[in-house]
Amino acid sequence: MFESAALGRSYPAKEYAALENDLRMKLFKAQGTCIEHKLPVLITIAGVDGSGRGAVANMLSEWMDAKTIRNHVFWMQTDEERTRPEAWQFWNKLPAGGEIGVFLGGWYGGTIRRFCCGDIGEREFNASMERWRRLEHTLASSRTVIVKLWLHLGKKVQKARLKDRLKHQEIHHFTPYDKKSAENYDGLVSAAAKAITLTDRVDAPWTVIDAYDGNFRNASVARAIIAAVEAAVAVKRQNAVPVAPT
């Protein structure tokens, strides 16, 4: 599943400079379309540690109008969230019509890492995936545009980046699961592949992205969002009921 996303593809700076301007314009236009049609957009950014999940969130806020973007991080639960139903922390932060909700990790990140670390078994993992699949179907049925991104790195590249982060003491924000799963690359990737297989649907598809090069990663993310919005608008127009002449 991840072989083509671990090739280390990149865009030279000159080529990317021209491409970036075009993608910025299209992404900004897509955001305007969502505002016009009052479409909520839910973007989940998941992936291996060191793949640039935070950088992608920053890029989206820079390339689009940040006033309608809401970024949410789901690395650790608060005390209140632990007393609530599992989905409460997410329902409470879903985007309204015309807004873009960026979920770092989303409802997949924690479950994938707990399964990878052995904290939950396969039955519980599968049950969680089924709940998220149903939730996404419900959201998509109510016109939410769902974009799910898995940012990927090859094993050697990820190991080198993690080592560099440790060297520069950039590990302090990791939860225990983050650190443990980061050191178990094969287990994390296996769990992610299983999650993607179980939840990749037409109304809530996954896009697996080669995150080796920031330029290639950013361009791929922008294209995925633009394509999702265009598809949602096309479906809306297709389903529109024509007004009978008076």
For each predicted feature, which ranges?
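Charged, amphipathic alpha-helical linker segments immediately N-terminal to NTP-binding catalytic cores
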Residues: 1-22
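Pre-Walker A adenine-sensing motif
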Residues: 25-35
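Phosphate-binding beta-loop-alpha motif at adenosine-nucleotide cofactor sites
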Residues: 43-46, 144-154, 176-180, 201-220
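A glycine- and Lys/Arg-enriched "phosphate-lid" helix/loop adjacent to the NTP-binding pocket
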Residues: 115-130, 139-190, 236-244
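P-loop NTPase motor core
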Residues: 79-137
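Glycine-rich phosphate-binding P-loop
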Residues: 43-60
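Short beta-strand-centered segment that lines the nucleotide-binding/catalytic pocket of NTP-utilizing
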Residues: 66-78
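NTP-dependent small-molecule kinase module
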Residues: 189-246
